[in-house]
Design a protein with these regions (language model features):
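Start-of-domain marker
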Residues: 3-64
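Detector for Asparagine
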Residues: 5-8, 33, 41, 73, ...
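Generic "edge-of-domain/loop-turn" microfeature
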Residues: 26-28, 43, 53, 66, ...
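Charged, gly/pro-rich active-site loop segments
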Residues: 91-114
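An acidic-aromatic
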Residues: 43-95
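Non-transmembrane domains of secretory- and envelope-associated proteins
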Residues: 72, 108-155
Length: 155
């Protein structure tokens, strides 16, 4: 039969949720539409799409690290949770992020102090959808230049 000729694809359940995010960084406020996807215990993706569904920024969190991709300027930065936790007294881990998302029904509020800078994130959560999808696709960073976090976020 035809079905026997197809390669086996592993499908996993992914939670998808549209969100409206307000990011306040040192008194400057930015509002944007985002798409949040969570593959349990594997990957959290936050796609920032402010205009017509075009992804300009992307945050990919795995259990080991966080990658911030600036697609507009073709650059990215990678940080371990240990490096992130050196910037702020608030401890952050993959499990904590996943728990925060799972428990949030309508809204997520998150404040982060990095030196003299304050970053506040407020996300209005839309309807959650659960679907089976193939393995998560991470951005191929070979197309981008690796830079420091300070080049992407001036902290």
């Amino acid at each position: 039969s035809c079905a026997s000729n197809r390669p086996n694809r592993v499908h996993k359940q992914v939670m998808t949720q549209r969100t409206q995010v307000t990011l306040t960084f040192d008194q400057h406020e930015y509002k944007t539409n985002c798409m949040l996807k969570v593959w349990k215990n594997e990957l959290i993706v936050l796609s920032v799409m402010p205009v017509m569904g075009i992804e300009l920024f992307r945050l990919e969190a795995t259990p080991d690290q966080v990658t911030i991709i600036d697609k507009l300027n073709r650059r990215y930065t990678i940080m371990t949770y240990e490096e992130i936790n050196k910037l702020s007294p608030r401890r952050i881990s993959y499990k904590m992020l996943q728990l925060l998302i799972n428990k949030a029904e309508k809204e997520i509020n998150f404040d982060l102090q990095a030196g003299t800078h304050t970053l506040q994130l407020k996300a209005n959560m839309g309807q959650r959808e659960y679907n089976n999808q193939k393995e998560p696709q991470m951005v191929n960073t070979n197309k981008y230049k690796q830079v420091s976090l300070r080049e992407i976020l001036p902290i």
